[in-house]
């Protein structure tokens, strides 16, 4: 019994060494209550005392003595032995964990800022000190931002207002150019509105307007259907030679089958268009194919449905723009200037001085299909005649 209190006396301060057994008995009720609470919270209390290798950090002598003393204490529950386990638990929570994260106590951490010789006992104090070296970035009071333009003396309190002001000096270099008057317009919507006015002033008093519509490529895409004198687009043979030779007009019972009249017109009303051949260059085949793909416009027979072929000239006036040149679709005239082509188209109008000028003469009355009868033989030899031979 005399050797038992020697074990815990190593963990106690120097003032507790001369204490007698009576003082231990006087403190025993309080320590007993603490021991009970610790045993309720941590059930493996005796096992904690049986793990002495953690105390090898304190030194070889202290580790051997502490490791030897708790071995007999694990089986005893005396009041004097409760101080040993509590000291070991407090030692593991205070000394073991901090040694991995913090420097040993008493070591000062110097400031890493240049010119600063201060040192601090903890990392938290050092972090608070570093804030004095790195203040948050803020604009100085009274600082003004000046515009960099040469003739501008505006100043602004912040950068956001300066950037918004800079847009007034550096607008995007974008514009939409009118093809008729070469006017530069800022927005695309304004270009549409301008094309209506520009087309009305550019065209002549004639009813059919030759200038383009709203789209830039509309002259080549919309006008060819009106100038097309060929039969219905369902036939494959006009694609081979659309304008070089007159379109054939079959006679007899084959006319209703070969010309289904997709625009609601009877075959006799289509004969003026089949007989009249404009005769422009063969380079317009691409325009004809493009109009076929887009679907024939119902306005194609306009001007020639109830009128003779001579009055159908306004609907046949078209031009083609390829490789920077404008080519007339009724004659061999070509130019690189749009106004020159517009003036040339006035000659093909019915009221113009040279209305019958283009290539081949046009008949004034609906042509008789009899002269075209010999031309129907090559068409019938390509497979059309055997189909309708029983009829």
Curated annotation (Swiss-Prot):
Polar residues: which segments have biased composition? Answer: 84-93
Q: Where is the composition biased (Pro residues)?
A: 227-236, 353-372
GO CC term, one of those recorded: nucleus
A molecular function (GO) held by this record is: DNA binding
Q: What is its main location?
A: nucleus
Q: Where is the protein localized?
A: Nucleus
According to the UniProt entry, which residue ranges have a biased composition of type Basic and acidic residues? 214-226
Entry-linked InterPro entries = ZN414, Znf-C2H2_ribbon, Znf_C2H2_type
Give start-end positions of each zinc finger (C2H2-type).
109-133, 145-169, 176-201, 326-348
Q: Which UniProt keywords apply?
A: DNA-binding, Metal-binding, Nucleus, Repeat, Transcription, Transcription regulation, Zinc, Zinc-finger
Sequence ranges of Low complexity compositional bias: 274-286
Its transmembrane ranges are: none
Q: Where is this region: Disordered?
A: 1-110, 201-243, 274-312, 344-391
Family, according to the entry, reads as follows:
Belongs to the krueppel C2H2-type zinc-finger protein family.
Instruction: Provide the function of this protein.
Output: May be involved in transcriptional regulation.
Q: What is this protein called?
A: Zinc finger protein 414
């Amino acid at each position: 019994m005399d050797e038992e209190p020697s074990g815990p006396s190593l963990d106690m301060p120097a003032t507790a060494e001369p204490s007698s057994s009576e003082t231990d008995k006087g403190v025993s009720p309080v320590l007993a209550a603490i021991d009970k609470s610790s045993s309720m919270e941590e059930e493996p209390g005796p096992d904690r005392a049986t793990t002495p290798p953690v105390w090898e950090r304190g030194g070889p002598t202290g580790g051997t003595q502490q490791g030897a003393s708790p071995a007999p204490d694990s089986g005893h529950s005396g009041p004097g032995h409760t101080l040993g386990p509590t000291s070991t638990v407090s030692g593991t929570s205070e000394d073991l964990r901090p040694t991995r994260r913090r420097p040993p106590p008493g070591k000062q951490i110097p400031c890493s800022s240049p010119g600063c010789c201060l040192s601090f006992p903890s990392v938290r104090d050092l972090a608070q000190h570093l804030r004095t070296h790195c203040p948050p970035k803020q604009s100085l009071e009274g600082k003004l931002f000046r515009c960099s333009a040469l003739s501008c003396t505006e100043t602004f309190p912040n950068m956001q207002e300066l950037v918004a002001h800079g847009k007034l000096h550096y607008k995007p270099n974008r514009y939409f150019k009118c093809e008729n008057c070469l006017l530069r317009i800022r927005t695309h919507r304004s270009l549409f509105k301008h094309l209506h006015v520009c087309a009305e002033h550019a065209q002549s008093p004639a009813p059919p307007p030759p200038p383009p519509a709203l789209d830039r490529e509309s002259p080549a895409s919309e006008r060819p259907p009106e100038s097309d004198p060929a039969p219905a687009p369902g036939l494959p043979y006009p694609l081979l030679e659309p304008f070089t030779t007159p379109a054939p007009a079959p006679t007899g019972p084959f006319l209703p089958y070969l010309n289904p009249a997709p625009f609601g017109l009877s075959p006799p009303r289509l004969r003026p268009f089949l007989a009249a051949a404009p005769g422009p260059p063969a380079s317009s085949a691409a325009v004809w194919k493009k109009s076929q793909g887009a679907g024939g416009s119902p306005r194609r027979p306009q001007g020639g449905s109830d009128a003779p072929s001579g009055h159908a000239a306004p609907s046949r006036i078209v031009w083609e723009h390829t490789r920077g040149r404008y080519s007339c679709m009724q004659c061999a005239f070509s130019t690189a200037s749009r106004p020159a082509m517009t003036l040339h188209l006035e000659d093909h109008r019915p009221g113009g001085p040279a209305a019958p000028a283009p290539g081949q003469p046009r008949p004034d009355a609906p042509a008789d299909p009899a002269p075209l009868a010999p031309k129907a033989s090559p068409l019938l030899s390509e497979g059309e005649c055997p189909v309708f031979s029983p009829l």
